[in-house]
Amino acid sequence: MKRLAIFCLFFFVQPTFAIGCINMKDNWIECLAQILKSEGGYVDDPRDNGGATNFGVTKKTYENWVGREVTKEDIKNLTIEDVAPIYKDRYWARVRADELVDGADLLLFDLSVHSGPRRSVKIAQETAGTVVDGLIGPKTVAAINAMDQTEFIKKFSENRLAFYKRIEAWKHFENGFRNRVKKTQIAAQQMVK
């Protein structure tokens, strides 16, 4: 995983972005590389509510980011340099991943990307036994960080899978959901120090 992170940093991301990452939590790039590995490239599956997507960024998300309508061709042409700031602002920062212990940061970040920051926080709150309101504050961060991380990772992954089983897309994407949860769980556990 570290090789993939380094590869993404030095071969896909422009030097100015890489320099901006120096002050971030050490494993931001490793977490981003894991997300990009899971998200893949351009897809436009009619069964997926996200529609045209590239590197996991939907057309709607990108339109909100740039403040204008975009075409599917614009989405096809996205680069890692285009999407990395979106990931940092819209998903990483909104779950306060910089404040979370290693492993938990990846779990919340990944689910934030896949199902939205609020859903990610709710599942984390359910897992940590705090008030479930979808708003991550100091109490939620402290509760997550205080848990045994192997236990947190296991329970969070179980709760995430239970959430997926309740949504309509489960019948079409069950295998993909299961694989993503398992791969993210393994990667998160490997980050625990």
Question: Where does each model-flagged region fall?
Answer:
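Sec-dependent N-terminal signal peptides
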Residues: 4-13
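Cell-wall polysaccharide-cleaving catalytic domain and substrate-binding groove, primarily
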Residues: 17-193
